[in-house]
Amino acid sequence: KLISRLYDADSGTVQIGGTDIREIHTDSLFKYVSIVFQEVILFNTSIMENIRLGRLDASDEEVIRAAKLAGCNEFVSRLPDTYQTIIGENGAKLSGGERQRLSIARAILKDAPIIILDEIAASLDVETEVQIQTGLNHLIQGKTVIVISHRLKSIENADKIVVMKAGTVEACGKHAHLLKQSPTYRKMIEKSN
């Protein structure tokens, strides 16, 4: 929420490329960041238009390409009006995994250099999580990715893991380092196994 400036820091700074984000106009900052939330925000319009929110000037072909990369095409092709199907308020006519894949497609279409994945697998079953992983792999390629997760499997291969405890940073490092240095991280791993 700090990176996307939903809130400003009470103290200290949040920087992108060495620039305090408070010095970056909100519209410009929005272009640099894509957020995929656990609770996907969808509108009572077509699948095509829900994905196009990632980049309003995208052609239909670009929207469909992003949808295919996110793994949407399989379920969309079974819908009565495919990409023109109206999905209901907040995607009520879709499963959680389908809604999540639309959100990933939207982020792929936006093609922002910074991706925030906020607990996106928390409410998904293991099979659905595996299905969306392919879309995520397309989304994060060559990007700066910030993953907020309690599912530790999803962060084990990260370049840098930040362990938070009671609102403060307890430790930073790679998985193997944190197993040795962070009691909190070690306990979380033990509980997840």
Question: Which role does the model predict for each range below?
Answer:
Residues 1-6, 27-39, 45-50, 66-72, ...:
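ABC-family ATPase nucleotide-binding domain "signature/switch" substructure
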Residues 52-60, 74:
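ABC-type ATPase nucleotide-binding domains, specifically the catalytic core motifs of the NBD
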Residues 180-193:
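C-terminal boundary and immediately downstream tail of ABC-type ATPase nucleotide-binding domains
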